[in-house]
């Protein structure tokens, strides 16, 4: 369709194999972020199967951790892996690498859309990674965000509804 063609022309780079994070008339931001997984998770996606597969595999390799998806790839000079410091410093790091568990639901939906039954082993692994966190840290819940580097310490709100709800959706 013309919408899919326009979207692909605007956001896709065949060589990079992923979507631009932001586009305007003058430039494109090629920071590798999880925002593109939403396009793969839609029932009527603007991405074709090969685009979605490339986005998901790249996201798995560059963003997926045992606690969620990083908000920015480590190979980006803007990457900040720890949520520490004063309020201004922490606020700045929030979208620069910090891990958000709630993004896992959309990642999982995209993975199922493309890989169908072959997605199940990865999704079970993702879910099972949280067993001790659910039992010990949040007593039935999980944190809002996590550091992007081992040991992936929980930060922010100790029991975040959108984080646990997306994990339940995976289950």
List the predicted regions and their residue ranges.
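Extended amphipathic alpha-helical segments enriched in small hydrophobics
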Residues: 1-4, 98-134
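Catalytic cores of carbohydrate-active enzymes
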Residues: 1-82, 125, 132-164
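Bulky hydrophobic/aromatic packing residues
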Residues: 10, 100-104, 162, 171
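Short, contiguous acidic/charged loop-to-helix segments that flank catalytic cores in large enzymes
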Residues: 27, 90-99, 112-118, 154-159
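Well-ordered alpha-helical scaffold segments within catalytic/enzyme domains
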Residues: 38-49, 105-117, 166-171
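The feature captures the short pre-catalytic strand/loop hairpin that immediately precedes
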Residues: 81-90
């Amino acid at each position: 369709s013309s919408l899919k063609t326009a979207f692909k022309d605007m956001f896709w780079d065949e060589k990079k194999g992923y979507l631009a994070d932001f586009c305007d008339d003058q430039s494109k931001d090629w920071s590798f972020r999880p925002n593109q997984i939403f396009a793969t998770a839609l029932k009527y996606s603007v991405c074709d199967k090969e685009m979605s597969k490339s986005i998901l595999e790249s996201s798995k390799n560059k963003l997926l951790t045992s606690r969620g998806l990083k908000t920015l790839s480590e190979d980006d000079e803007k990457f900040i892996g720890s949520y520490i410091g004063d309020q201004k410093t922490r606020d700045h790091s929030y979208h620069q690498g910090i891990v958000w568990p709630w993004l896992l639901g959309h990642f999982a939906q995209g993975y199922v859309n493309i890989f169908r039954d072959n997605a199940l082993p990865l999704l079970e692994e993702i879910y099972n990674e949280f067993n001790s966190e659910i039992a010990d840290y949040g007593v039935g819940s999980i944190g809002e965000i996590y550091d992007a580097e081992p040991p992936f310490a929980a930060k922010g709100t100790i029991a975040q509804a959108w984080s646990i709800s997306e994990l339940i959706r995976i289950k």
